[in-house]
Amino acid sequence: MSAQLIDGNALAKQIRSEAAVRAARLTERGHQPGLAVVLVGEDPASQVYVRNKVKACEDNGFHSSLDRYPADLSEAELLARIDALNNDPKIHGILVQLPLPKHIDSHKVLEAIAPEKDVDGFHVANAGALMTGAPLFRPCTPYGCMKMLESISYPLRGARAVVVGASNIVGKPMAMLLLQAGATVTICNSKTRDIGAHTRDADVIVAAVGKRNLITADMVKPGAVVIDVGMNRDDNGKLCGDVDFAGVREVAGYITPVPGGVGPMTITMLLINTLEAAERAAG
């Protein structure tokens, strides 16, 4: 029997609709939620991501500004722009699109964003707060994954969860959110000897590596929930995830597709973080 799909597009639409209502209420009070997106350079993928984020804002009643800069922008100039955005009362969230050109220190730039406007959740203050269970903002992709699990009313308390991938953006915060929900969590990284030995016992698998067909049917327990964060291209140039979708869907209980799974949820949770920042600022 095939796994049930967790439809990220449908869930994102529902959450965005609710966010638009909250945004309209704030706007009526003179506090329209505002997101500033900063793009440095001409990376094609980054341009697509940025365009999608700006459109999502505009479609749901948010104010958005897009600052595009050439790849030779100096680090000092970028930091000065972030400082100006930190002090702009119409901007509640600041997002610097990664990757940045090599001559710019990404860590320094992310740390320059005011924690109360760090809607990506990457600032060390927010990362630390996530560890203690009281974050201002949850990183958007893990937050979206948790919403997907919530949408199927999955009982995480006591469940065995395996996160494949240990990045600061997805893997580590994902593990923390699962831990806080009561799951017993294992993180697999590039040094893990036998990933399948861990995933075969898992009730929930989150694959976030960026390697096509990393998770195959023989690595999945029947009935498990499989969340695919990966974004890759197959031999025909079609988008695919880290999971062998055709094979794994015959074993899993629930599975997210690529595209149409985690991707739409990431941008949706960016809107939610921006909305919450605006609500806090409005009082």
From Swiss-Prot:
Physiological role: Catalyzes the oxidation of 5,10-methylenetetrahydrofolate to 5,10-methenyltetrahydrofolate and then the hydrolysis of 5,10-methenyltetrahydrofolate to 10-formyltetrahydrofolate.
A single cellular component GO annotation: cytosol
Catalytically driven reaction(s): (6R)-5,10-methylene-5,6,7,8-tetrahydrofolate + NADP(+) = (6R)-5,10-methenyltetrahydrofolate + NADPH; (6R)-5,10-methenyltetrahydrofolate + H2O = (6R)-10-formyltetrahydrofolate + H(+)
UniProt name for this protein: Bifunctional protein FolD
InterPro entries: Aminoacid_DH-like_N_sf, NAD(P)-bd_dom_sf, THF_DH/CycHdrlase, THF_DH/CycHdrlase_cat_dom, THF_DH/CycHdrlase_CS, THF_DH/CycHdrlase_NAD-bd_dom
Gene3D superfamilies referenced in this protein's UniProt entry, alphabetically: Leucine Dehydrogenase, chain A, domain 1, NAD(P)-binding Rossmann-like Domain
List of residues binding NADP(+): G165, A166, S167, S190
Pathway this chain belongs to: One-carbon metabolism; tetrahydrofolate interconversion
Family assignment from sequence similarity: Belongs to the tetrahydrofolate dehydrogenase/cyclohydrolase family.
Organism listed in the record: Cupriavidus pinatubonensis (strain JMP 134 / LMG 1197) (Cupriavidus necator (strain JMP 134))
Keyword RNA-binding: no
The enzyme's E.C. designation: 1.5.1.5, 3.5.4.9
Keyword Hydrolase among UniProt keywords: yes
Keywords on record: Amino-acid biosynthesis, Histidine biosynthesis, Hydrolase, Methionine biosynthesis, Multifunctional enzyme, NADP, One-carbon metabolism, Oxidoreductase, Purine biosynthesis
GO molecular-function term, one example from the UniProt record: methenyltetrahydrofolate cyclohydrolase activity
